[in-house]
Swiss-Prot record:
Its main location: secreted. It comes from Mus musculus. InterPro entries: EGF-like_dom (IPR000742), Laminin/Netrin_ECM (IPR050440), Laminin_IV (IPR000034), Laminin_N (IPR008211), LE_dom (IPR002049), LMN_ATRN_NET-like_EGF (IPR056863). Glycans are attached at residues 128, 304, 337, 640, 849, 991, 1162, 1196, 1320, 1514. Residues 280-335, 336-391, 392-438, 439-488, 489-498, 685-718, 719-766, 767-821, 822-877, 878-927, 928-975, 976-1024 form the Laminin EGF-like domain. It comes from the Eukaryota. Strongly expressed in capillaries and arterioles of kidney as well as in interstitial Leydig cells of testis. Residues 40-279 form the Laminin N-terminal domain. This is Laminin subunit gamma-3. The gene is Lamc3. GO terms for cellular component: basement membrane; extracellular region. Residues 1025-1581 are annotated as: Domain II and I. The keyword Cell division does not apply. It is found in: Secreted, Extracellular space, Extracellular matrix, Basement membrane.
């Protein structure tokens, strides 16, 4: 049943909508187009649509906020509930209002749901659903589809317009009266108000439980529904902008009364679809709606309508009232008819009623008016309706009415004329309300009638006034015949005010030629003069032309009174003729002018000659003038007329006959003499001040010509004599008095001063200057200043010397001294001021890097001749090398020699001294330390320090032999010449013997050992077969025999061992030197005596110094420097002592070599034994034939060879002795060099101590009285005295400190003595051990050599008996040799054992020394830190001292004591800067000692002003000296400093290179800019 009712209701709604649509549209009308096919307007409507689709609906209550459970009904009551959950935060469980108007699908339904009854949703609590349509719609139906059962009561409301009240549309309720107070089933009768909402219970049943529909038709039950277009009430009824669904009561089964939560959760509102059918309301004037510019939905209006709903006409379409479009009539808005003169109109209902056109035009243009702008405004007209309206423009004063006729002509008053009545009739002027007034112009000054508008008369050039009745300023004498009306005032240009002069009458200057030419002369072109042709009738004018008649003197001169008057020429012309062309020429005052006649007479046909007159007006306004002149210049020409001539150009071809000049008349004036017409053109001037005379031609009394002798045209100016005399009016020269002079008496005479312009007799007073010379007065103060002081003097009273001079000319500071020129050696700018002191003459602005009282010295940092004539020869910068100099800008001012660091030479300290190398910044150079024996000279490479070595010598100091060389001596080292095949190494022993490989023997390892032979291919020595063992045994026996023979030889008295020997050929070792021994012994003894003497001298000097130090009392005044010198000398002697010890060590090494060479070795004994053996062989030679002969021959050969060797060895010994002597001399030279090296150090240390003591003197006073800096310079001398007293008090403390320092130094030397002795002992032991080893090696080698020789003799002796004898002797010799070798070897072992013990002792002592050195290093670092702090403190004191000395120097320039203090302060700054640089360079390596530095800072911070500053300074000095010694050592710090200095030097060189490059670039840039500026403008681009 319910489904059938819903379907029937939907059918009813559909049929009703169809009826409405058919009612809205006529048959065949196109609903979507507003115009038909021919362009006629027709009703149009937007498409029918679901206005709710896609629009956002709002619900007052929605489930899921918070989440809740709901249990929908799925069957009959009592069936089980299947509960679900509504959660707005979960999209899958959300049921908000957006699901009301979305796309509705029965298969996948979405719905909006309210909270359940469990949350209080039940009557009287309502749930509202609101839908905003965005604009007015014409609603056809409203449809709701419920997801649950339909409510028991709900209502539909609507708004007719936005923000309007809610109006009920329909009520649905099973209790209409109870719930809404409305009867159920109400219906309307025709004529009743159809805007009534009905209430029905048709859709209030609980079934169906889901999917129930409710459809509401807006026109159902409305009687006028079928006449909708004629019913405004129903049109308003269906119009809605918003729809509201109010859900008021739920349908239940009645089980809710038990309040079961599960039951309550089953009752709620749920709507799955909310549809609103209708059209966008456009009143039949639009076919579509779209968003406007504001984003609001609006109709796209047609039919000249506008508005959101097309509810009104456009502004200019108001010709009929707006109406809704119907099927019969589209009711298009029509435009207003404004005749094209307006675009604005309004609807005028009264006009529409009377005329049928309601458009009333507004703001008509083009001067139109009327409802349709159809006529002209008042006082406008137009020729025809198509032409625009034009203003009448009738003159309000001249017209009778402002309205004109259709042609635009205005009605005029009398005396007024014109199209617009805007001008006066001729002879009238000044149009006004009363008409026009008649003109009254002056005839003499006007040129015609007056201006009809203003009434002003047209005046002549020099006339003014509305009636032209007065002359302009600067003119006078108004005359009718004057073309300009009035004549200009002349007055010689001094006045513009003049008037006619009284007492003058008219006068004529005339020539009538009755009695002759009257002084006239004629001149033709190219001819100076010619005779005149005169007759009683006149002068005959030439017919050829180019003739000029010159007037006599009476016409010339001052003719100013003829200005403006005519010159009349009377001519007699032939019958019927006319006068020829004639011009009047005027000359004067350097000007010239030609005039033509003002009028020419017309020719007359007469048969008699007739007279005619030609008139020339003497006025600049004459139109006939050629090259007219200004007024003033014209009158100036007349004032000095020098020529008046008549120039004829000849008669033309039409002229014939004679022309006679009958009369010439010039009108002028002169003073009144008789009755005659007055000459009103003569002026009298009103002269300004300073002028007088009728024409202002004279200067008044007290005035003069501005230009002397300038004449009347020159201006007059007051006499400028300043009341000290009078002046001539023409020259202006003053006759001065009162001691004044000048053209205007404007100045006092020389020797007088004052203000001559005051005009009093005592203006000028005598000058108070030397010799009453000239002076002047300062205007501001009135002081008198002398202006012509004697040469070299200046000042107000010449009391001081001129710039560049000095002296005291007036004796203001003592006896007068004349001013003398300052002598600045030509080193000042003569154009500058303040070059020297005006009192002392000391130069103040020295140029060219000079200084001194007379600029006679070079400034610090420069050197040269300050008095040289050329600037280029003057002082040049020191340019000291930063690496080798103490300061970059400190050098000898004359020679330029820089103050070099130790062992640095060169003018700029750029290279090391000979014997030194490695120039480093702040340190200087270090000694080459070239070995005196191994080097050629005590010079080395300046960078690497490599010494020039002797042959075979190597090492940086040339202190060792090269590999493969031996015998280090004065000649170098000799080549070992070891056999490359047999020697194990190319290096040999000091005795030249080589180390042999197995199987090789010999000094040079150049032969095979016994029982060995040289293998094939020279690959080495191989052992012989076993058969040669017998030979070896025999050789052993021979060696034993030789040993016996040696013992026998040593026991017997064989005489001198130096006799000739018969030995085998071989090379003697180095130690086998046996001749010249006594010479070497004597030389060595002498040298040792000299060294002992030198040592005694040093000790004696030291004792004398100790005694001298004991006698000198350092506490006495002035002895401080002496003590410092002694301390420095002590250090120098200590350094010298060290050098002597090093030299003694070297000499001991030489002595050991000499000892080894002075005593005969075992080889000598062997040689003696070989000689005895040879003699024995010679005695038995007769018994052994062949063998003896061969042995004898071998012995003799050996003897001869020995003799040769004897001579060579002797010569070598002598040469080596000389070499040793040279070595001694070289050692002595090296000792001298060492002393020379130590001397600069001592001098530098002495200078440093002096400087520190000198620096401390001014600082001690500041340390005790730090507040002294606050006093003025007046008490500086007292402070100096106080400082001297303090210095005297502190000097004993300084002396004690120095003594303590000396004691410490002595103790340090005493501590070093055991180490020195230990070193000497170690060196001696090492030398003895080395000598012993070498001697043993030589002995063994000698024995082996002798054995080899004897075995060779055996090979050459084949007889068995001889071999046996030789073998026996050789065996004895060998035995003796072996015993001796063992003995020498044991002795060497004992010596080496002692050396080992000494070496261990030395090592132990060395460790102790190392520990002590570390302690000393720590102490040195601590002292260094104290020195740094002291240096900083001293720096502050130095800066304070400098400031004080600078103030004192400025205030007391003449104080020599203060100047000396200033120089000392500068020396302090220089010394401290050096120390600062040294400390800064050492800072990196001393960073680990910060702890001790902190302790020292605390100590110094607690130091008060009453503590002994001298002790602190002495400690600082010791620390600095310790630092210097540490830097001089060759440790890691020295290495690092050297690396840093080298890197700094490289960087400085690179920076200097960059600066040089930059300077070159700047110079090139400057040159290019100069070239560019010198180029022409066209080339520069």
């Amino acid at each position: 049943m319910a489904v059938s009712r819903v379907l029937s209701l939907l059918a009813t709604v559909a049929s009703m909508a169809l009826v409405i649509q058919e009612t809205h549209f006529a048959a065949g009308a196109d609903m979507g187009s507003c115009y038909d096919g021919v362009g006629r307007a027709q009703r149009c409507l937007p498409e029918f649509e679901n206005a709710a689709f896609g629009r956002r609906a709002e619900a007052s209550h929605t489930c899921g906020r918070p989440p809740e459970d709901f249990c929908p009904h799925v069957g009959a009551p009592g069936a089980g509930l299947q509960c679900q959950r509504c959660d707005d935060a979960d999209p899958g469980r959300r049921h908000d209002a957006s699901y009301l108007t979305d796309f509705h699908s029965p298969d996948d339904s979405t719905w909006w749901q309210s909270p359940s009854m469990a949350f209080g949703v039940q009557y009287p609590t309502s749930v509202n659903l609101t839908l905003s349509l965005g604009k007015a719609y014409e609603i056809t139906y409203v449809r709701l589809k419920f997801h649950t059962s339909r409510p028991e009561s709900f209502a539909i409301y609507k708004r007719t317009y936005a923000s309007g009240p809610w109006e009920p549309y329909q009520y649905y309720s099973a209790s209409c009266q109870k719930t809404y107070g409305r009867p159920e089933g109400h219906y309307l009768r025709p004529g009743e108000d159809e805007r009534v909402a009905f209430c029905t219970s048709e859709f209030s049943d609980i079934s169906p439980l889901n999917g129930g529909n409710v459809a509401f038709s807006t026109l159902e039950g409305r009687p006028s529904a079928y006449n909708f277009e004629e019913s405004p009430v129903l049109q308003e009824w269906v119009t809605s902008t918003d729809i509201l669904i109010s859900l008021d009561r739920l349908n239940t089964f009645g089980d809710d009364i038990f309040k079961d939560p599960r039951v309550l959760q089953s009752y709620y509102y749920a709507v799955s679809d909310f549809s609103v059918g209708g059209r966008c309301k456009c009143n039949g004037h639009a076919s579509e709606c779209e968003p406007n510019a504001a984003g609001q939905l609006a109709c796209r209006c047609q039919h000249n309508t506008t508005g959101v709903d097309c509810e009104r006409c456009l502004p200019f379409f108001q010709d009929r009232p707006w109406a809704r479009g119907t099927a019969e009539d589209a009711n298009e808005c029509l435009p207003c008819n404004c005749s094209g003169h307006s675009e604005e109109c309004t609807f005028d209902r009264e006009l529409y009623r009377s005329t049928g056109h309601g458009g009333h035009c507004q703001r008509c243009r083009d001067h139109t008016t009327g409802p349709h702008c159809e006529r002209c405004e008042k006082n406008y007209y137009r020729w025809s309706p198509k032409t625009p309206c034009q203003p009448c423009d009738c003159h309000p004063a001249g017209s009778l009415s402002l309205q004109c006729d259709n042609s635009g002509v205005c009605p005029c008053k009398p005396t007024v004329t014109g199209w617009k009545c805007d001008r006066c009739l001729p002879g009238f002027h000044s149009l006004s309300e009363g008409g026009c007034r008649p003109c009254a112009c002056n005839v003499a000054g006007s040129l015609g009638t007056c201006d009809p508008r203003s009434g002003n008369c047209p005046c002549k050039e020099n006339v003014e006034g509305s009636l032209c009745d007065r002359c302009r300023p600067g003119t006078f004498n108004l005359q009718p015949h004057n073309p300009v009306g009035c004549s200009s005032c002349f007055c010689y240009g001094h006045s513009k005010v003049c008037s006619p002069a009284a007492g003058f009458q008219e006068h004529h200057i005339r020539s009538d030629f009755r009695h002759g030419a009257g002084g006239w002369q004629i001149r033709s072109m190219g001819v100076s003069k010619r005779p005149l042709q005169w007759s009683q009738s006149g002068l005959l004018l030439g017919l050829r032309g180019g003739e000029e008649l010159s007037a006599p003197k009476k016409f010339l001169g001052d003719q100013r009174l003829s200005y403006g008057q005519p010159v009349i020429l009377t001519l007699q012309v032939p019958p019927g003729g006319s006068p020829p062309p004639i011009q009047l020429r005027l000359e004067g005052a350097g000007l010239a002018l030609s005039l033509r006649p003002s009028s020419l007479p017309s020719p007359q046909d007469t048969r008699q000659p007739r007279r005619v007159q030609l008139q020339f007006l003497l006025q600049e306004t004459s139109e006939e003038a050629e090259s007219p002149l200004p007024t003033f210049h014209f009158q100036r020409l007349l004032s000095n007329l020098t020529a008046l001539s008549i120039w004829t150009s000849g008669q033309g071809p039409g002229h014939s006959g004679q022309v006679l000049l009958c009369e010439v008349q010039l009108t002028s004036a002169w003073p009144q003499r008789e009755l005659a017409p007055p000459a009103s053109w003569v002026e009298t001037c009103l002269c300004p001040q300073g002028y007088t005379g009728q024409f202002c031609e004279f200067c008044a009394l007290g005035y003069k010509r501005e230009i002397p002798h300038g004449g009347p045209y020159a201006n007059c100016i007051p006499c400028t004599c300043n009341q000290h005399g009078t002046c001539d009016p023409n020259t202006g020269i003053c006759l001065c008095g009162h001691h004044t002079e000048g053209p205007s008496c404007e100045r006092c005479m020389p020797g007088f001063y004052g203000n001559a312009f005051s005009g009093r007799a005592d203006d000028c007073q005598p000058c108070p200057c030397p010799g009453q010379s000239a002076c002047a007065t300062i205007p501001e103060s009135g002081d008198v200043v002398c202006t012509h002081c004697p040469p070299g003097q200046r000042g107000r009273r010449c009391e001081s010397c001129e710039d560049g001079f000095f002296g005291d000319p007036l004796g203001l500071s003592g006896a007068p001294q004349p001013c003398r020129r300052c002598q600045c050696s030509g080193n000042v700018d003569l154009n500058a001021v303040g070059n020297c002191d005006p009192h002392s003459g000391h130069c103040l602005r020295c140029l060219y890097n000079t200084t001194g009282a007379h600029c006679e010295h070079c400034r610090e940092g420069f050197y040269g001749s300050a008095v040289a004539t050329r600037p280029v020869d003057k002082c040049a910068p020191c340019s000291c090398d930063l690496r080798g100099s103490v300061s970059e800008k400190t050098c000898n001012p004359v020679t330029g020699q820089c103050v070099c660091l130790p062992y640095v030479s060169g003018r700029d300290c750029s290279r090391c001294s000979p014997g030194f190398y490695d120039l480093q910044s702040g340190r200087g150079c270090q000694s080459c330390k070239c070995h005196p024996l191994g080097s050629l000279e005590n010079k080395c490479h300046p960078k690497t320090g490599q010494c020039p070595c002797r042959p075979g010598v190597t090492g940086q100091a040339c202190d060792r032999c090269q590999l493969g060389f031996f015998g280090f001596s004065i000649k170098g080292c000799r080549d070992c010449r070891c056999s490359p095949l047999g020697a194990a190494s190319s290096q040999c022993h000091e005795n030249s013997t080589c180390v042999c490989r197995p199987g090789f023997v010999g000094y040079k390892c150049d032969r095979c050992q016994d029982n060995f032979f040289l293998a094939d291919g020279d690959t080495g020595c191989q052992e012989c077969p076993t058969c040669y063992a017998l030979v070896k045994e025999e050789a052993a026996k021979l060696k034993a025999r030789l040993m016996l023979m040696e013992g026998w030889l040593q026991r017997s008295d064989c005489g001198s061992p130096w006799g000739p020997l018969d030995i085998l050929q071989g090379e003697a070792p180095l130690g086998d030197v046996y001749q010249g021994h006594h010479l070497l012994q004597e030389t060595r003894g002498t040298f040792l005596q000299q060294m002992v003497g030198l040592e005694d001298s040093v000790k004696a000097t030291w004792e004398q110094l100790q005694v001298l130090r004991g006698h000198v009392h350092c506490a006495q005044a002035g002895a401080q420097k002496t003590c410092i010198q002694l301390a420095e000398l002590e250090e120098t002697l200590q350094s010298s002592e060290e050098e002597v010890l090093r030299a003694a060590s070297a000499l001991s090494f030489l002595a050991s070599l000499q000892k080894g060479s002075s005593t005969p070795t075992n080889w000598s004994h062997l040689a003696s034994e070989a000689q005895i053996l040879a003699r024995s062989h010679r005695d038995t030679a007769t018994k052994i034939e062949a063998t003896s002969e061969r042995a004898l021959l071998a012995s003799n050969a050996s003897y001869e060879l020995l003799k040769l060797m004897e001579g060579r060895v002797a010569s070598e010994a002598q040469q080596e002795l000389e070499d040793r002597y040279q070595e001694v001399q070289a050692a002595q030279t090296a000792l001298g060099i060492a002393v020379a090296e130590a001397l600069p150090k001592a001098e530098k240390a002495l200078a440093t101590v002096k400087q520190v003591i000198g620096d401390a003197a001014p600082h001690l006073g500041l340390l005790v009285t730090p507040e002294a800096m606050n006093f003025q310079a007046r008490g500086l001398s007292w402070k100096v005295k106080a400082l001297e007293q303090k210095l005297e008090q502190k000097e004993p403390e300084v002396g004690q400190s120095v003594g303590a320092l000396q004691v410490e130094a002595g103790r340090a030397l005493e501590k070093m003595e055991p180490f020195m002795q230990l070193r000497n002992k170690t060196t001696a032991a090492f030398t003895r051990a080395s000598s012993a080893v070498q001697a043993a090696k030589v002995t063994v080698i000698g024995a082996e050599t002798l054995l080899a020789d004897l075995e060779g003799m055996k090979l050459r002796s084949p007889l068995p008996k001889e071999q046996a004898a030789l073998k026996k002797k050789a065996g004895s010799i060998r035995t003796r040799l072996l015993e001796d070798t063992k003995r020498k070897t044991k002795q060497a072992e004992r010596m080496l054992g002692n050396a080992a013990s000494l070496s261990s002792s030395t090592k132990k002592k060395s460790k102790e020394a190392e520990l002590m050195s570390k302690d000393n290093a720590k102490l040195s670092r601590a002292l260094l830190r104290e020195g740094k702090q002291g240096y900083r403190h001293a720096s502050r004191l130095a800066s304070q001292t400098q400031a004080t000395l600078r103030r004192a120097s400025r205030l007391l320039l003449t104080s020599e004591a203060h100047k000396q203090e200033l120089e000392e302060a500068k020396q302090v700054t220089s010394g401290l800067s050096t120390v600062e640089r040294q400390i800064r360079e050492s800072r990196i390596s001393l960073e680990k000692d910060t702890k001790v530095l902190s302790e020292l800072l605390v100590k110094l911070g607690s130091l008060g002003v009453h503590q002994a500053p001298a002790q602190t300074l002495n400690e600082t000095q010791r620390a600095l000296e310790s630092l210097r010694l540490q830097l001089d050592s060759h440790g890691a710090l020295h290495h690092k400093l050297r690396q840093l200095e080298e890197e700094s030097a490289r960087q400085e060189l690179q920076i200097q290179s960059f600066e040089d490059d930059l300077a070159e670039i700047r110079a090139d840039k400057h040159n290019l800019e100069t070239i560019l500026s010198s180029l022409p403008e066209n080339c520069a681009s």
